[in-house]
Each structure stands twice: as C-alpha cells, then as structure tokens.
Amino acid sequence: SSTVAVKRKNMKHYSVGSIIWIIVEYASLIFFGFCAIIPIVSCITTAFKTDAEYQNTNVMAFPGSWLNFDNFVNAFKTANMGRAFLNSVIVMVVVLTVSVIVGSQLAYVLNRFKFPGNGFIRNLYTIAALLPAVAMQVTVYQIMSDLHLVNSLGGYIIMSCGTDVISMYIFIQFMENIPLSLDESAIIDGANYWQIYWKIMLPLLKPAIVTSCILKGVGVYNEYYAANLYLMRKEIRTMALSLYTFVGPMGSKYNLICAGVIISLLPALIVFVCCQKQIYSGITAGAVKG
C-alpha cells in the first residue's frame, strides 16, 4: 500500500546507527515495561492462591481458582483493614486540607507581596526540602515524645502536616500565571487581601490544588516509616501499616500480604478512575487563563 511505501522510503533516510539506537530504545522500553508488570501480575496471582498452592508453585503460576476470595476476607478481618482505612482517610483529609490552605496562603504572600526577606524565606523552605526526612526523625521523635504525642493518631496528623515545600512551589508556579490586574480590580471594588485570597485566588488554583493533593495524598496514604514509628497501637494503624500484621518471626504469609495490598490499592484505583479527567488536567495545566 501507499502507507507502507512511504514508511519504507522514510526508513532509507535513517543511518544504520540510528536504526540500531531505535531498536535499543524500544527494547529497553519493553524490558522495563515487563519489569514493572511482573510484580503486579505476581501479586495478583499470589493473592488468589491457597497456602498449598503458594508453597508448591512459582510466583507467576496461575491459581487453581480465580474465585478463591478467602485470602481477601482473612486479610480484611485479621488486619482490621476497615478501621485502618478509616484512619488513613482521617489522616489524609486533615493533612490535605491543612496542606492546601497553608501552602496556598504562604504562596500568595510570597508571590504577591515583595518585602525584605522574601527571597530569604524561600531559600529557607528550599533548604528544608533538601534535608532528608529520615535524618530529622530523631529530633522530631524526641519533640513528639516530650509533648506526649507518640502513639496517637492526632500526634501523627500534626507531624504529617509539617512543611510541605513541594505544594508551596506548585501554588507559586500557578500564581505567577494569574495577572495582578485581578487583584487590582478587586481592590478597586473594595475587597481586602483576605477576600481576594478566598474569592479569587483559591478558585483559580483548582488545577494546582488537584496536583498538590495527588502528590501529597499518595505520600500520606503510602507512608510506612513514620506510621510504624508513631502508630504502635493496632486500633490507630493506617492501611500501609496494617499489612505488617502478616509479618512475624515464624515467617510471612505472602498470599495474605498480596491480598491486603490489592485491597489497599482499590480505593486509590477507584479515585483515579472516577477523577482521571481532573487529575490529568491538574498535572498538565501550566497556566490559568482569566
């Protein structure tokens, strides 16, 4: 056909080195694609296997029955995943609300008001972002312990609401595309800065809010290290920490762990399917049009 002829004609313009490089690129993509898919397939197949099937078959072998939901039921009950999910939702709602309000207000001040020390404050937040969180946990844990906030869901929420530099810079980036004429027009109409923030800035920052909530929400939902450090009581564990129930000194029940992993992924998958349009628009939007 004419299409095939055109493709063959275009291929003549490629050198041997270019063709080899294209082959290497596609081969690399296929290889890394398999590397990403294999653990997911292994997790799904293992979640449906009985204990005997898991011990006597390899991880990629299909289970005897895809209708074996015993692992899911046992994982949900044993790890008290219903309560863990509720705890995760509480943490996420509070942390994301605080992150959006504080981050957007801080970005509004740093972007709209030019005052002595503006650049210094930005540099301080940049330095805070460069400090590894693990290295600061000793000091943070001592402070939380002195305040009797360890082993408390409220204390963990307060700790998780700490400096969110990424969200602040996301809001600053979006605000730079919002014309100052909107602020000036609102001031002429009698609005103060507080009203400008709530009635003009915040509604226009919806794409940035979506982006910030995605980045922060995924991190909070999947957080294991800090949750394991501050949430020791079973009734206040989060979803990520509840999976540790099946790990013991006598071994790990990987079929139950895989079932728990799938259960913990379902809420995030449902949110993604229902809100994928807003998610994509929030990530790709680089400007706000007035």
What are the residue ranges of the model-derived segments?
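Short, Lys/Arg-rich, polar N-terminal cytosolic tail immediately upstream
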Residues: 1-16
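A structural signal for multi-pass alpha-helical bundles of membrane permease subunits
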Residues: 13-17, 21-290
